UniProtKB/Swiss-Prot annotation:
Family: Belongs to the AP2/ERF transcription factor family. RAV subfamily.
Tissue note: Expressed in all tissues examined: Roots, rosette leaves, cauline leaves, inflorescence stems, flowers and siliques. Highest expression in roots and rosette leaves. Very low expression in flowers.
Function: Binds specifically to bipartite recognition sequences composed of two unrelated motifs, 5'-CAACA-3' and 5'-CACCTG-3'. May function as negative regulator of plant growth and development.
Protein name from the UniProt record: AP2/ERF and B3 domain-containing transcription factor RAV1
Subcellular location, record wording: Nucleus
Length: 344
């Protein structure tokens, strides 16, 4: 199992639109990047002042590339009149290629690239479209874009589809496989607590599971954290920072976790499951199911009084900004129907 770590000091939760700064020459972050599963996270390294210094240096022949006082080259792109820093590179053409990748993601059909003879294949286009702008910027800044692209291509079969096979059983009432993939080894499950899905924006991993399945390379890395990729049953990749907190002596998933909680509508008592592929890539997977543990088929929908009553609707129906369950919704529908009956 591989792993990847990135200095936490380069990470913030701000916008991706940041202004680069003068920094002393240093080695590429690739050398310090460990990988666990297929890890990554959004890293925002705000640097200020490079633009002023760059004006004193010869300009680049490439679009979106600026010279650095230390002899290296920076790449940048503008989004809504704000500059997005794409990273620093040893070679001018490396920075130009990073700009080309970003402009494809930001401008799509309107992209004007430096290397017009280089055409993206369908796999790369799909890869770009399946990741947010901030995720692509993150990969470029950490010089992991090419590696993650190749990993994505290896997970595809000859038809260009993800090579995953759902289990024929084990579907939760959210329509999601709790174990994920037939070729995957189930690692462990955890019922999330109120604090796991609350404002702390972190998931505590039980210590014995953390040390067995997600061992950190060293104490130094434990503090900085490693970057993990988990793929869900829909093929979406979730990026979490995983580290050890000395203050609470616990292993936690932090950055990226709150987005997962929000999208999957997790509540206290719901169960998240983790598994790993048996293949050479050791891909990590994440699944989830509601606390009810119902074995209802997600495709089975009861239609009553013109309303679809299903597990999904029970979790998402909102009336007057208040979430209601199936029973409450049915009561509302019946009362409305009764009023209409008497009126006629």
């Amino acid at each position: 199992m591989e792993s990847s770590s990135v200095d936490e000091s380069t990470t913030s939760t701000g916008s991706i639109c940041e202004t680069p700064a003068i920094t002393p020459a240093k080695k590429s972050s690739v050398g310090n990047l460990y990988r666990m599963g297929s890890g990554s996270s959004v890293v925002l390294d705000s640097e200020n002042g490079v633009e002023a210094e760059s004006r004193k240096l010869p300009s680049s022949k490439y679009k979106g590339v600026v010279p650095q006082p230390n002899g290296r080259w920076g790449a940048q792109i503008y989004e809504k009149h704000q500059r997005v820093w794409l990273g620093t590179f040893n070679e001018e053409d490396e920075a130009a290629r990073a700009y080309d990748v970003a402009v494809h993601r930001f401008r799509r059909r309107d992209a004007v690239t430096n290397f017009k003879d280089v055409k993206m294949d369908e796999d790369e286009v799909d890869f770009l479209n399946s990741h947010s702008k901030s995720e692509i910027v993150d990969m470029l800044r950490k010089h992991t874009y090419n590696e993650e692209l190749e990993q994505s291509k290896r997970r595809r079969n000859g038809n260009g589809n993800m090579t995953r096979t759902l289990l024929t059983s084990g579907l939760s009432n959210d329509g999601v496989s709790t174990t994920g993939f037939r070729s995957a080894e189930a690692l462990f499950e955890k019922a999330v607590t109120p604090s796991d899905v609350g404002k702390l924006n972190r998931l505590v991993i039980p210590k014995h599971h953390a040390e067995k399945h997600f061992p950190l390379p060293s104490s130094n890395v434990s503090v900085k954290g490693v970057l993990l990729n988990f793929e869900d049953v829909n093929g979406k990749v979730w990026r979490f920072r995983y580290s050890y907190w000395n203050s609470s002596q616990s292993y936690v998933l932090t950055k990226g976790w709150s987005r997962f909680v929000k999208e999957k509508n997790l509540r206290a008592g719901d169960v998240v499951s983790f598994s790993r592929s048996n293949g050479q890539d050791q891909q990590l997977y994440i699944g989830w199911k509601s606390r009810s543990g119902s074995d209802l088929d997600a495709g089975r929908v009861l239609r009553l009084f013109g309303v679809n009553i299903s597990p999904e609707s029970s979790r998402n129906d909102v009336v007057g900004n208040k979430r209601v369950n199936d029973t409450e919704m049915l009561s509302l529908v019946c009362s409305k129907k009764q009023r209409i009956f008497h009126a006629s």
